Amino acid sequence: MSKINMNEDIDKDFSSHTPMMQQYLKLKAQHPEILLFYRMGDFYELFYDDAKRASQLLDISLTKRGASAGEPIPMAGIPHHAVENYLAKLVNQGESVAICEQIGDPATSKGPVERKVVRIVTPGTISDEALLQERQDNLLAAIWQDGKGYGYATLDISSGRFRLSEPADRETMAAELQRTNPAELLYAEDFAEMALIEGRRGLRRRPLWEFEIDTARQQLNLQFGTRDLVGFGVENASRGLCAAGCLLQYVKDTQRTSLPHIRSITMERQQDSIIMDAATRRNLEITQNLAGGIENTLAAVLDCTVTPMGSRMLKRWLHMPIRNTDILRERQQTIGALQDTVSELQPVLRQVGDLERILARLALRTARPRDLARMRHAFQQLPELHAQLETVDSAPVQALRKKMGDFAELRDLLERAIIDAPPVLVRDGGVIAPGYHQELDEWRALADGATDYLDRLEIRERERTGLDTLKVGYNAVHGYYIQISRGQSHLAPINYVRRQTLKNAERYIIPELKEYEDKVLTSKGKALALEKQLYDELFDLLLPHLADLQQSASALAELDVLVNLAERAYTLNYTCPTFTDKPGIRIIEGRHPVVEQVLNEPFIANPLNLSPQRRMLIITGPNMGGKSTYMRQTALIALLAWIGSYVPAQNVEIGPIDRIFTRVGAADDLASGRSTFMVEMTETANILHNATENSLVLMDEIGRGTSTYDGLSLAWACAENLANKIKALTLFATHYFELTQLPEKMEGVANVHLDALEHGDTIAFMHSVQDGAASKSYGLAVAALAGVPKEVIKRARQKLRELESISPNAAATQVDGTQMSLLAAPEETSPAVEALENLDPDSLTPRQALEWIYRLKSLV
């Protein structure tokens, strides 16, 4: 929190403060929770606790500014021209900043210059190029919860992409948070599931009324210019709309301008995509590896896109594979059709740049001159792209080409209006091209003519006075002046009026120079004011085309993704998978897309066959043998297929998949007080509750975090449930060799193993998948390979022989229903035992005792 410290004895009515500080305190009171950048001349100043906080966050000096109400005022400041760099640092630390500008004219103001907050910069609403990661989406999100489930909305303000969903349960909501990874998350003040969002960046607590459903509908209809939300398919999504309404209100509050690029909202439904929970996304290392970096991830291998907007779209595809095979087949067809034109298309696409985010800044009217120059450059690539795509014989490609548009008129406008290499800011001047506007050219000619005159004046005066150190200069405080060195200043003519004394020079003014100074400043000021006006008019000319421009940017991003996938398919030897309605996955010579790129030796490709008759594979073999790689590659091949990409295999045939689950590896979740085994069991429970017969399930080493018999029992029961009840497509890796007996007891279960060769104290991993169970685990050989001391390995071998002599069949213990007592219900007591328990032997005669013996014998 960044609040003014009331311990500073600041009066609530502000009357004891100077007028300037009164103005500051009133503005700060409107934004108590965030930092306030208060414009004063060429600096943004921060005061009180804001100053202390900013000095720590930005590593800038903390000073004092006089006194107000009798106390020194802590102060820190940053130059206005460097504000973007400081904002970037603050946003990266999750801070929000209110930008307060001078909107009045200091020359005409009585008292403090009028100021107001013109925008609020927050982590989820930034659109400035300097503040954004160019190849990552930057999302603002809002979450709502009621008794029926969750509402979740996300907005990418830098593209206008507005989405909502209604996760039914906590696991699905957690998966959505993991997938979208918002930069800023809004939640209601009474949100009950704080454990779900704790630790996330950019948390913002919002009042309940902002989530009110009627307000949400009103806000959204107002934004989209509609009477209802039926056309967007979200009319009945009340929980999602509550979140979306809060989000839109927050954006309007912070941006303080219209948002014409936010034109629609889309409902994301579970049935449209392949669902992956948070653990699955983490374990598959799609865009982030287990260490939190981006190296050796699926995206790192697959993403060779040439535009930032293409890179962001590819990552969205990877995190949300779709189930619509018509769209997927179109993507496959496009990839195949583009393979011969990759080398021609990519250099041209590279010149398009990040048109998507430029358009967002255009919509917010914050686009800078260089944004418009980049937009012009993107338009200049369109004719070449159209020419290259025109000859491609593919209906999807031609549909994309049509969406790209031409924009010849806008290209011509920007070529006439903006110079080739404009400055960073319009206030620097020199943005509008010569010839675009006659009056501007006239004012510039006056300014340039006056400047030429001043150059001639300097030469004339130097010759007239004979003073070789004489020169004409200018600064913002004293205007134009004639400067003479201290050594020659005594020779200055009598009509020179001293204006400023420096250490080594004197500065003078003459009437003629003052006259031309007025001309120069007037003409420059008029030119700059007109230039700003013309620049604003460019927005008015461009914005009516915003919808078509956004469609073009989306088409260009999609083209970049598909051209990239075509290049990756050719370069990495990927093939086109076939979709089928039959359940199962059949892979011939499948490879792990990431591991094969980092290996120094050739990757050993492996087959996989899952079908209704072979729904579960029990995978055995040594550690480091490749079990986890084999399992993950199956999931990654499936994932690539369901985004429309080619895949690393000789041939793939894939049936319907609704979810991908992974229970692979685990670590203690110390923050939540959960052990490795607890994490493992929680993830396992999620799979057993939510998997279906169309789910792809990867289970690696279930039950290893507890005692042998507990672990074996759990692994057996989980495998049995997945194979018999759920009937999911399952890869089940285990070190419990007892589980290799499952195929004999259940239909649809098969054994496969990864083999190794042991020679003396060395071991060679074959990494080749074979049918049948592994013959041994090679645990001691792997331990030796890891560098465990030889005496420990020797002792382990002795102990192994002892254990095997006690239980020769220990490696193949028969596990059946009678040995599952740990999880089974208590056995029923036999009739013989019940009879004996009810018998009183002291009351029996010898004859009765004999009769009981015969009766008990008959009961056994």
Swiss-Prot record:
GO terms for molecular function: ATP binding; ATP-dependent DNA damage sensor activity; damaged DNA binding; mismatched DNA binding. The keyword Iron does not apply. Pfam families: MutS_I, MutS_II, MutS_III, MutS_IV, MutS_V. ATP binds at G621, P622, N623, M624, G625, G626, K627, S628. GO terms for cellular component: cytosol. InterPro entries: DNA_mismatch_repair_MutS, DNA_mismatch_repair_MutS-lik_N, DNA_mismatch_repair_MutS/MSH, DNA_mismatch_repair_MutS_C, DNA_mismatch_repair_MutS_clamp, DNA_mismatch_repair_MutS_core, DNA_mismatch_repair_MutS_N, DNA_mismatch_repair_MutS_sf. Keywords: ATP-binding, DNA damage, DNA repair, DNA-binding, Nucleotide-binding. One of its GO terms (biological process) is mismatch repair. This protein is involved in the repair of mismatches in DNA. It is possible that it carries out the mismatch recognition step. This protein has a weak ATPase activity. NCBIfam families: mutS1 (TIGR01070), PRK05399.1 (NF003810). Belongs to the DNA mismatch repair MutS family. This is DNA mismatch repair protein MutS. It comes from Salmonella arizonae (strain ATCC BAA-731 / CDC346-86 / RSK2980).
